[in-house]
Design a protein with these regions (language model features):
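Active-site loop/oxyanion-hole signature of alpha/beta-hydrolase fold enzymes
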Residues: 20, 60-102, 270
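Short beta-strand/loop motif that positions the catalytic acidic residue
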Residues: 218, 224-226
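Flexible "cap/lid" loop of the alpha/beta hydrolase fold
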Residues: 115, 122-152
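Conserved HGGG/HGGXW glycine-rich cap/lid loop of the alpha/beta-hydrolase fold
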Residues: 21-68
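Alpha/beta-hydrolase fold catalytic core
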Residues: 1-31, 53-56, 95-97, 270-279
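Conserved alpha/beta-hydrolase catalytic His-Asp/Glu region
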Residues: 156-217
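Catalytic active-site module of serine/aspartate enzymes centered on a nucleophile-bearing elbow/loop
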Residues: 248-279
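Acidic catalytic loop of the alpha/beta-hydrolase fold
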Residues: 229-233
Length: 279
């Protein structure tokens, strides 16, 4: 475990989600990390610890049916459902000024939350995610969105196949421990949640224009970090984040793929802490 990171459980929306936290626990201002798929609060452990070490409160939650957190009965595995869960989590933590850090599907989840409480958004860090004008689903997402085929694919995802698939297109390769951590959490409930979430999201680029219209006039401080070789969300979308965040600081990392916080952790930590330190 990273130094200074506390692991606990937090009662939210009828379940007890896993919480990673560092820094002053009573601060109402916090850096809030939202993971993507496949992922969990564990994705952010090192960055939670690093940010907490600067005196900023930092938190990361498991989303329902990811990591070690079981969704409550009736939970909707949709962007709106997860955004509502995030809102309730922030309320339970007493956080009302948010520096949002998001990755992958944590992007639409976090940005939809932000659209409902834009006054609470102090800054945003987008890591291979954000508004995606004109984006069409990648091949793996199309498999997940297809009935029967998606279920068969999920049922046959062995550890070895998972490692190969996730590492595909990653120039540096991802750390073995990171891959195994993701697979260990990729159980039946998470695999079902992934199918539901992707099947509910017909057009991942559709909300971008409305979000940009809402966010752009506010010129919220933003940091964009994108792996140059992301095979799921192409790096051309990095600069397009300025449609929503006109003054965004954009960094496209050579040699990185979809998980730059895993394949270039020192660079991501430096960029994030430098950005937050200037706010």
């Amino acid at each position: 475990m990273s130094e200074g990171v506390e692991r606990s459980r937090l009662a939210v929306a009828g379940t007890r989600t896993r919480l990673l936290q560092a820094g002053p626990r009573d601060s109402r201002e916090a850096l809030v990390f939202v993971h993507g798929n496949p992922g969990s609060a564990d994705d952010w452990e090192a960055l939670v610890g690093a940010a907490g070490g600067t005196g900023l409160r930092a938190v990361a939650l498991d989303l329902p049916d990811f990591g070690e957190t079981i969704a409550p009965p009736g939970f909707q595995h949709t962007v709106l459902g997860y955004a509502g869960f995030l809102a309730q989590g922030l309320e339970a933590l007493g956080i009302d000024r948010v520096h949002l850090a998001i990755h992958d599907f944590g992007g639409p989840i976090g940005l939809v939350w932000a659209a409902t409480d834009v006054e609470a958004l102090a800054s945003v860090t987008l890591i291979d995610t954000g508004i995606l004008p004109g984006y069409r689903w990648h091949r793996l997402a199309r498999i997940w969105r297809t009935p029967v085929i998606g279920e068969l694919f999920q049922a046959t995802a062995t550890r070895g196949a998972f490692r190969w698939l996730v590492n595909r297109g990653e120039p540096r390769g991802l750390p073995r421990a990171f891959l195994d951590q993701m697979y260990d959490h990729y159980d039946r409930r998470t695999r079902r949640a992934v199918l539901k979430l992707y099947r509910d999201t017909d057009d991942p680029g559709a909300a971008g224009a409305e979000l940009a219209k809402l966010m752009a006039p506010r010129d919220i401080p933003a940091l964009v970090i994108w792996g140059e070789h992301d095979v799921y969300l192409p790096a051309k979308f990095a600069e397009r984040q300025r449609q929503a965040f006109p003054s965004a600081e954009v960094h496209v990392l050579p040699g990185s793929g979809h998980w730059p916080f895993a394949d270039a952790p020192e660079t991501v930590e430096r960029l994030l802490l430098d950005f937050l330190g200037r706010l």
